[in-house]
Amino acid sequence: MSASIVIGTQWGDEGKGKIIDIIASRADVVVRSQGGNNAGHTVVSGGETYKLHLIPSGILYKNTLCLIGAGVVLDPKDFTKELDSMESKGISLDNLRIDPRAHVTMPWHIALDGLSEQFRGNSDIGTTKRGIGPAYMDKYERSGIRVYDLVHPEVFAEKARSAGKLKNKIITEVYGGEPIDIEAVIKEYTEYGKRIAKYVDDVSVIVYNAHKEGKTIMFEGAQATLLDIDFGTYPYVTSSHPVSAGVCVGTGVGPMLIDEIIGVAKAYTTRVGKGPFPTELDDETGDTIRNKGGEFGTTTGRPRRTGWFDAVIVRHSVRVNGLSKLAINKLDTLSGIGDLKVCVAYEKPDGSRITDFPPVLEELADCKPVYETLQGFDEDISSCKSFNELPASCKAYIEKLEELCGCKIAMIGNGPDRTQIIER
């Protein structure tokens, strides 16, 4: 019996899907706690690529119970497409459950997301424009539509008319946008409700009972620590809590249930969208890492910004999440890059150095990275099965990251397939 959380330690896209998939293969229950279809997990298994946005990665295992918690905002249109995609590949959905408390992303949320970003102009946040922020706004304004409402047509119609009327007023009178046909939305989304009704159940109760029965549970986080609404690089963050504490809130479980918290990082750093990025590489090395690592967004297709590994960031994540261990992905991408730099501290404008991540954006923007240079490696490490098989400089790199981050590196990804993992 165990309960573990998998958390991103950087700005997302760390390869959590791969680590989650490996752990999910050993779990009885896999739970998604927060976020929406703005997040994407890519899992490569048996030559088949699965791109999951809302459905937990455990769906690939027929005996694994897959749960979507109350902290998630669910886009029914995209969700049904994902259901169709899984079914077309022969994946059973019998073990899928959705908490009735989860909030629903509606068309007006998506419209308002885009209009708001457009209104901000050069000060835009760089959202995925999938309505996540506006959906969470309604949740905390206590005016949101939940999955329970969606699967009860009369309740849904009443709430949709009320919400839609107000949102159309904002869309047309504040932003000058085109109004949404509310009745058409009700008709369309009522059908989505019928489709997903059979999956609705109380996730908090299911998880609690599974724990009492001694089952192995894994909680998968979406996004990452530096996108957390409180502990990320605000305002360039998501609208929920991707940190470990957010998992407990988003699924309705107590923190004493959790046995292990695993943080996932890349062997370098990437970021999508705007905001400070101390170790960013705007040169040929950055382009090489991007192309070798396939650094393009699962959800948006946007090219990711690339940079050297930042130990200041990961140390912040170790502390904020209470990490038990780390998994480092895409070590193979760094083969042939040359000497490797690691950010060990930040230098402030007055010349002083700090080793803790700044709490506010304004301070971070003024920081310059302080690097330590390590010997690179040219060998192909994709077939290595153990830590001892790695080149000496490769092992030294991992050991240095472990020392700087103050957390054991227990897993090393050395290729895209789920089998390309070294455990130590």
Give the label of every model feature segment.
Residues M1-R424:
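Non-transmembrane, aqueous-exposed alpha-helical and coiled segments at domain scale
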